[in-house]
Amino acid sequence: MSATEPTNEKVDKIVSDDEDEDIDQLVADLQSNPGAGDEEEEEENDSSFKAVPEELLQTDPRVGLTDDEVTKRRKRYGLNQMAEEQENLVLKFVMFFVGPIQFVMEAAAVLAAGLEDWVDFGVICALLLLNAFVGFIQEYQAGSIVDELKKTLANSALVVRNGQLVEIPANEVVPGDILQLEDGTVIPTDGRIVSEDCLLQVDQSAITGESLAVDKRSGDSCYSSSTVKTGEAFMIVTATGDSTFVGRAAALVNKASAGTGHFTEVLNGIGTTLLVFVIVTLLVVWVACFYRTVRIVPILRYTLAITIIGVPVGLPAVVTTTMAVGAAYLAKKQAIVQKLSAIESLAGVEILCSDKTGTLTKNKLSLHEPYTVEGVEPDDLMLTACLAASRKKKGLDAIDKAFLKSLINYPRAKAALPKYKVIEFQPFDPVSKKVTAIVESPEGERIICVKGAPLFVLKTVEDDHPIPEDVHENYQNTVAEFASRGFRSLGVARKRGEGHWEILGIMPCMDPPRDDTAATVNEARRLGLRVKMLTGDAVGIAKETCRQLGLGTNIYDADRLGLSGGGDMAGSEIADFVENADGFAEGFPTNKYNAVEILQSRGYLVAMTGDGVNDAPSLKKADTGIAVEGATDAARSAADIVFLAPGLSAIIDALKTSRQIFHRMYSYVVYRIALSLHLELFLGLWIAILNRSLDINLIVFIAIFADVATLAIAYDNAPYDPKPVKWNLPRLWGMSIVLGIILAIGTWITLTTMLLPKGGIIQNFGGLDGILFLQISLTENWLIFVTRAQGPFWSSIPSWQLSGAVLIVDIIATCFTLFGWWSQNWTDIVTVVRTWIWSFGVFCVMGGAYYLMSTSEAFDNFCNGRKPQQHTDKRSLEDFLVSMQRVSTQHEKST
């Protein structure tokens, strides 16, 4: 076969060898099963950019590259494959032992081993390993994303080399190669069509996510992983490997994977602050001990005690358990959580960037009210259009399926259709832009039926005879109106026997919104969520979909972002543009990624939905990546949450649940920080002033009891906030400090009054350590009932799991005191009852203080302070960063 004479064996094949299926049965199947035949519409499941100079793209299509040229270009640009970065899993696991809380736990383990306190050593090491294993397992899955992207690439390619058409492995293609494209070709690289007078239909769903094929002519660009549906042409390769769109998408995924997650930053910030408190407390204790010439072993024991209680060693485990229980609950609602921290992020999401197809819409074409020429009945138009449709269920395209399913609304056309006999059927011709069928009516009349691009159908009629001016004008105006509203229009015409062609009208069709989407969008607004559409579809289609859903219609072409070296907006103007836009259409992976990144730079928590390979980078970049029903493997791997139920409503349900889970975590963190501050203040003062401390074993039990009792917080009854929730850390610290001080004062009063001759807690006998242990355990355990409530602590009934866990721990702590476990001696029941009563009094004081703080706007303002206005500086920084990005892009293109 010649390089310039592609085979035409499969071209112009009019009738398949397969028998036509019964039209009545086909229509019945399609109408009874809305998903019938749709499986073939679904998408396949599955470094640095090197621009190629234009002088290397002047290859003669008839000759191609020589072997020497191929060798030179392969040395310069490498193989046509994505770079593989081997991740060191051992190092990845070790990094989970790095962090403020982990450092304190490790220091405590070393101290415990040095003091031969093997019980404490074992407990601390077990907590360290538990936290590390949970984190490692959650993040290990991310490494499969690039592998899933690779599955979309072709395995072989037909190229012109040395004047001959040869088949080679796809990874051996180099820039400047001439590729032959034909029906079914999976394009292995990015390139530009060089054949004259050609027309291809290319499925770009792997890039744009939109299932309808697009037309490509001479000079148009084609992209790696796209599939040629119909037509033949030659293409010159302009980019290979990591420089292709799919390669750059993989690079964006790797870039998005880098860095520390939002929740990890919050925990590290809390741990770092507590570590500072620990260091300050230790300095005070050491100075006091050295002043009294205390021996080194007691000093080390004091250090171990303060280290254990100063940082909440169980914080990661309890928070992880809370999110894991929430993930199990979400799984029952068909939402699979792949990254636990996504639950926390989803609770604070303010902007949802949603893909259109399949999420907001049904991903199935449906017909709308047709335009008919005067004198033509809609049933006649529908009958003609359905006659010009394939009758084979296997391979039936989306448009024919939509017409046949809609026959239920046209009973006369449906009844007449089986009476016609198909003599000849010509599938869609990308050149004439029409589908043609020759049929025989029940009366024996031969009729030619066509449907296709409206203006091409109009020209067919005009070539046969003049059309009245008013009909012509109305027809063209209707085409323009449908196009402006985002409809895909199909013209319909017929020719009876030897008569003239008749123009019948136009049938508009589009992917309609899901039935529940409009209500769900309103619910999202009520929850303080802004929905922006990011789609690869046309601007007109996106606007019409937004109009039907009640979303804003400020939809723009994604090219207007101007982040690839074009555009004249400054960085701050681009950020304003993205922030105020209701969505972007005709976008590629980089456009979606950039939009998410810009919104994040403005301080928003962003969620992104998607289903295709093209969505993988933005799914990974978003604070919460959401793969919707039917998503490809690459999208599912990149996402934090995978939904098995269709539509946006499932996402809103998950949002409410995540806010409930966040409320539980926030309650626990306030509680746990207050506990750490309580014991640091009390023990630090006790050691510094009286040179005494609790038994180290009792301190360990206090820490364990605090976390064991509150593990049940994961099952607590919790409300969901009506607005996005975030970590208000200044306020959180303010509340924790006040509660910690109240706890410390309560314990100090217990210590200083228990040995008084009259009115003390202990009369003539009892253990000092035992009473303090009980008082600390009771007040700390009950504190969770204060922090979990949004109002007074009695306004919200805790779950039986939480109440039961706290009660069991309280009983165990009471037994410790009654029987003198790990303390000097046993304590009588009267003293224990007095301790319970006193502890309840401290609990009531904490409840009142917490309620006042949580409802006081003045307290919130005091904690947060007055932030200086930095908008000008921020906008200047945005301008500078975008300018540098454009310079970098232009430099890459010129090298």
Swiss-Prot record:
This protein's record includes keyword Cell membrane: yes
Catalytic activity: ATP + H2O + H(+)(in) = ADP + phosphate + 2 H(+)(out)
Record EC number: 7.1.2.1
Subcellular location per the Swiss-Prot or TrEMBL entry: Cell membrane
Keyword terms, alphabetized: ATP-binding, Cell membrane, Hydrogen ion transport, Ion transport, Magnesium, Membrane, Metal-binding, Nucleotide-binding, Phosphoprotein, Translocase, Transmembrane, Transmembrane helix, Transport
Lineage: superkingdom: Eukaryota
Membrane-crossing segments per the record: 93-113, 118-137, 269-290, 302-324, 697-715, 732-751, 802-822, 835-851
Extracellular face residues: 114-117, 291-301, 716-731, 823-834
Record-linked Pfam families: Cation_ATPase_N, E1-E2_ATPase, Hydrolase
Chain ranges on the Cytoplasmic side, renumbered to this chain: 1-92, 138-268, 325-696, 752-801, 852-895
GO biological process annotation, one example: proton export across plasma membrane
Top-level enzyme category: translocase
Main location: membrane
Composition bias type Acidic residues, residue spans: 37-46
Binding site for Mg(2+): D611, D615
SMART domains, per the entry: Cation_ATPase_N (SM00831)
Region listing for Disordered, in residue ranges: 1-53
Family stated for the protein in its record: Belongs to the cation transport ATPase (P-type) (TC 3.A.3) family. Type IIIA subfamily.
Descriptive protein name: Plasma membrane ATPase 1
Species this protein is from: Candida albicans
Lineage: Eukaryota, Fungi, Dikarya, Ascomycota, Saccharomycotina
Originating gene: PMA1
